[in-house]
Amino acid sequence: MILCIGDVLSLAELQQILSLIADAEFVDGALTAGWNARLVKNNRQMPKGSLQQRKIEEIILAALERNLLFQMAARPKLIHSILISCYEAGMSYGTHTDDALMLDRHQLMRTDISFTLFLSAPEDYDGGELKIESSEGEQAYKLPAGALILYPASTLHRVEPVTRGIRYAAVSWVQSLIRDPQEREILFDLQTVRQQMFQESGKTRHFDLISKVYANLLRKWAEL
């Protein structure tokens, strides 16, 4: 499932992040890529553990925690440290798939889901689209600042060359409580339906039954 979520960050949060970025130093982004992805990664990245990176991560994690749509779709068990990337004119990230396992904070995690949180307005740069390959073909994404895209970490994807301006984005990975993507989507759909049912009719017999199905599937599939 690929899902775009708008307004993950408030305007105040976005402005605070951009202010922190303006004061930050960036290093070669290839340093954090896998051995093969390193060959096609040409961007800059905020050093992990720097003061600005830690403050930005705190803002983003708080925003993700309160975002119901993100929580429903991702079912996060672990979230990798947030990477803040910078693409200037001529920079890109060629076709690659993310590492299946990543070591973060001395803990090995499985990458089920990738996400990109756009920090630059689309009109501030040309190029820089995130392109994701799937069985339905290739799709390009260039979202408003503060919007986020969730997509399977198993996909081939790339960032097109930036030809003007600067593209800032926050990137990370989720180990989900629900490993199987089809099971995650089933739970997402059920949760969406039961919320709609409750809004329209309240706590009815039908709502109770679908809530039972939802809870029992979550109990069956969750990996703690």
Curated annotation (Swiss-Prot):
Pfam families: 2OG-FeII_Oxy_3, PKHD_C. Gene3D superfamilies: q2cbj1_9rhob like domain, Rabenosyn, Rab binding domain. GO terms for biological process: DNA damage response; intracellular iron ion homeostasis. Keywords: Dioxygenase, Iron, Metal-binding, Oxidoreductase, Vitamin C. Signal peptide: none annotated. Its cofactor is Fe(2+); L-ascorbate. Residues 78-176 form the Fe2OG dioxygenase domain. Fe cation binds at residues 96, 98, 157. Binds 1 Fe(2+) ion per subunit. One of its GO terms (molecular function) is 2-oxoglutarate-dependent dioxygenase activity. 2-oxoglutarate binds at residue 167. Its EC number is 1.14.11.-. NCBIfam families: PRK05467.1-3, PRK05467.1-4. This is PKHD-type hydroxylase CYB_2270. It comes from Synechococcus sp. (strain JA-2-3B'a(2-13)).
